[in-house]
Amino acid sequence: MDYMARRELSRAQLHKKLQPYAEDEDELERVLNEFAQKSWQSDERFTQAFVRSKSTKHGSARLQQELKAHGVSADLIRDALPSREEELRNAIGVARKKFKQPAQNFEEKQKQMRFLLYRGFSSGIAQAALKADWDEEEPWDSEG
């Protein structure tokens, strides 16, 4: 219980943590169902907290991959991922924090693009982020 109070866990994570202590699989499922019923554990809450904490540094592809690894359903993942505008804003912030200025040549642009792709941003979002005017306060547009 102490561990659950400190941070949200997915059902799959909790299952893995409790499995060594369970007598059998049925008992473990009963406990997990009770936790969900009492709202002590919620995959939806876990997914929202996870996306909220990581979305400013990572793109949708990476978030989706990590959430799948935590055993979260595709429906919950799809509902929790940031909008295209939010993701573009995050990609611009990540690029500016890392590189401080726009690419001066093709090699620098490739390096910046690889960095954003590694962070899980789609190629379209990464290209739009690198094309954004670095001097503007809000450098994205809604058609992005």
Show where each model-derived region lies.
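An alpha-helical, amphipathic repeat domain used for nucleic-acid recognition
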Residues: 1-144
